[in-house]
From Swiss-Prot:
It comes from Buchnera aphidicola subsp. Baizongia pistaciae (strain Bp). GO terms for cellular component: cytosol. This is Protein GrpE 1. GO terms for biological process: protein folding. It holds the Pfam family GrpE. SUPFAM superfamilies: Coiled-coil domain of nucleotide exchange factor GrpE (SSF58014), Head domain of nucleotide exchange factor GrpE (SSF51064). The keyword Chaperone applies. The lineage of its organism: Bacteria, Pseudomonadati, Pseudomonadota, Gammaproteobacteria, Enterobacterales.
Length: 198
């Protein structure tokens, strides 16, 4: 029986040692597993942080883009409003040109030696000047200069005239004034252009 007890005792010791080894192995395995889990979690956190930073950067870039687009839109809208304001009177002003032309033509026909006609002339001249001052107030300028180079953007040549005194391709005479509304041509000036004798 002693042998059996010894065997039994050794068996129990082996079992205890075996259990302790298993516990130690399990502890080491659990420790390694916990370290692996911690490393994995840290890596995941780092990945999430990178993703978050990228998304944040993208959102900031989009915010700047939207701000810039709004600024550009505001600038364009202001330009359109200014342009619409400047040129809103274009058709009205253009319809006044025949009246102005008729008044100027009538003023050129007057003989200045008759007193009554002279009074009428002065009144018509005042009306004409008042009308032109009003147009200038709204940004209209007349094209009436002579002895300047012919410019097809603002002049329309009716005919040419041979001249030795004036340079070739210069405006000799204005037959009908032209008009600009700010920088936009409303009507070209009808002109006679010089031509050198060849």
């Amino acid at each position: 029986m002693n042998i059996d007890n010894d065997l039994l005792s050794k068996n129990k010791e082996a079992k205890v040692v075996s259990e302790n080894s298993t516990v130690e192995i399990n502890d080491v395995t659990n420790s390694d597993s916990k370290n692996t889990d911690n490393d994995f979690q840290t890596e995941e956190l780092n990945n999430f942080e990178k993703i978050f930073l990228n998304l944040n950067s993208d959102l900031l870039n989009q915010q700047l883009l939207v701000k810039n687009n709004l600024k550009l839109y505001k600038i364009r809208a202001e330009k359109e409003i200014n342009r619409a304001y400047k040129f809103s009177l274009k058709s009205f002003i253009s319809s006044l040109f025949p009246v102005i032309d008729s008044m100027e033509y009538a003023l050129n026909l007057f003989k200045k030696d008759d007193k009554i006609l002279c009074l009428i002339f002065n009144e018509l001249d005042n009306v004409s000047q008042s009308l032109m001052n009003l147009l200038v107030k709204f940004g209209v300028t007349s094209i009436k200069d002579i002895n300047i180079a012919f410019n097809p953007d603002i002049h329309q040549a009716i005919t040419t005239q041979v001249s030795k005194d004036i340079k070739n391709n210069y405006v000799i005479s204005i037959m009908q004034k032209g008009y600009l509304l700010y920088d936009r041509l409303l009507r070209p000036a009808m002109v006679i252009v010089s031509k050198n004798d060849i």
